[in-house]
C-alpha cells in the first residue's frame, strides 16, 4: 500500500484527534497539539459531511472551550487553517480564535 505524504498527514491528524477525544472524555484538559488536532479533524470531517466554508469557520470556534484545555492554550492558538476537501474541491478553512 502506498500512502502519499498528504494522506499520511491526514492519518496522523485522525490518530492525534482520536487520542485527544479519549483524553477529553476522561476529563483531562487538552494540550496544544491535542487541541489543534481535534479541531482540525472536526473541520476536515465537517467538510466531507457537506458543510460550507462559512459554516465551518463559525462552527470551528465552538468545538472546544477554555474549560477543555490547559491554561494558556487558547492564547497560543490565534487561528487554525486547514485545507479541507469539499464536494467541489479543496478549500482553505480559517478559524480565528478557535478556543473561546
UniProtKB/Swiss-Prot annotation:
Induction behaviour: By urea and nitrogen starvation.
PANTHER family in the cross-refs: UREASE
Identification of the protein by name: Urease subunit gamma
GO biological processes: urea catabolic process
Pfam families, alphabetized: Urease_gamma
UniProt KW Hydrolase keyword: yes
UniProt keyword Cytoplasm present: yes
Enzyme kind, highest EC tier: hydrolase
Record-stated family: Belongs to the urease gamma subunit family.
Pathway(s) of this molecule: Nitrogen metabolism; urea degradation; CO(2) and NH(3) from urea (urease route): step 1/1
Cellular component GO terms held in the UniProt record: cytoplasm
Enzyme Commission number(s): 3.5.1.5
Subunit organization: Heterotrimer of UreA (gamma), UreB (beta) and UreC (alpha) subunits. Three heterotrimers associate to form the active enzyme.
NCBIfam families, alphabetized: PRK13241.1, urease_gam
Record field: catalytic activity: urea + 2 H2O + H(+) = hydrogencarbonate + 2 NH4(+)
Subcellular location, record wording: Cytoplasm
GO terms of molecular function: nickel cation binding; urease activity
Swiss-Prot/TrEMBL keywords: Cytoplasm, Hydrolase
